[in-house]
């Protein structure tokens, strides 16, 4: 499952959504750096956490809306259920994931809320430093 998710994840779009209005304020180099950080963050924290807490994953349904899709799954772990939906779109002829919705909460929008608060309180540079440090902690 991890390979399927990582291999089909649109980290740039996820990063754009997560950074919101601050994305356009960043240079191309900063955008690429942030996308790399978000890739590491997603792989090392979110996906690892999901995989650790997953005994069985059930694919419940798909909703196709033109060039977008929503794939609904249920992850079971030690008797508890977590609903994980994958928001997907066609990019370059391939279906790619750009967001995960865990028990009704969008990961990208939750990131955006936290990132806006951090940038407003400190700075974009501090957000990047913290994300890098937290990603290194999990390796």
Residues covered by each model-derived region:
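Surface-exposed, charged secondary-structure patches
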Residues: 43-82, 134-139
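Short beta-strand edge/turn micro-motifs at domain boundaries
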Residues: 81-109
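Early exported N-terminus immediately downstream of N-terminal targeting peptides
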Residues: 1-46
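Intrinsically disordered, low-complexity linear regions
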Residues: 3-14, 74-77, 91, 137
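Low-complexity, intrinsically disordered terminal/linker segments enriched in charged
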Residues: 102-139
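Alpha-helix boundary/capping detector
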Residues: 31, 49, 60-64, 121, ...
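Juxtamembrane/interface motifs at transmembrane-helix termini
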Residues: 20-22, 51-57, 117-119
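Short leucine-rich amphipathic alpha-helices used at interfaces
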Residues: 1-3, 7-9, 14-15, 46, ...
